[in-house]
Amino acid sequence: SSWSNADEGYILLSNNSSNIESWSKISLPMGPYGFDHNKYNHAASGDINNDGFIDVVVSITRDLPYYEGAYIQVLINDGQGALKDMTETNFFNQPRSQTHHGEGNIYLRDMNLDGSIDIIHSTRDYSSGYHGAHIAINDGNGNFNSITNDDLPNKPNSGYNNYDFLMKSLPINIDNEACIDFISVTDAGWENSTDETSNYLFTVLNTACNF
């Protein structure tokens, strides 16, 4: 079948052949900001509800206001390769979805070592009042709750922008102690090159796997 302007995205479902044109094309659910106003930044796949099928998590922002809002869409595999948008029931509370810069990467890692995949959305912002290091914990059934600001430290240096909340988060086991930690960064300003700080990386260690 042909591509349609009525759809915003597709999954190409392999039939185990190398002929991509013969693969099935499955329409994706529409994003939260209305048709043709969603900007899809990044996606990651994994079995988030432990049913044996691969699901997809998508980071989405909007076109107007430009890149305002950082939304995470949870798409659950029905077992036949079709993805159902379960965000309203599985990840309803998302305060960053309206007033947080929308650019960022999605990572799926088991942050608290409970056997279920959690979501890490690596973003940045200067005014929302939320960390750009966004970690959402899975309850084991594919339902997510974001950890609070108080569960994470502020930046050791607020930087040129005088903003204390964390920018970015790359999940990695830094200290080889089983728990997943992450690397963050100060975000240099660019408005005045004579006053801006230099970017530098710093680590946040998850010492008890208790996110």
Label the model's feature ranges:
Residues 35-41, 59-63, 67-70, 122:
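Beta-propeller domains
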Residues 39-48, 102-113, 165-174:
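Beta-propeller blade termini
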Residues 47-49, 53, 78-79, 110-112, ...:
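Calcium-coordinating acidic loop motifs
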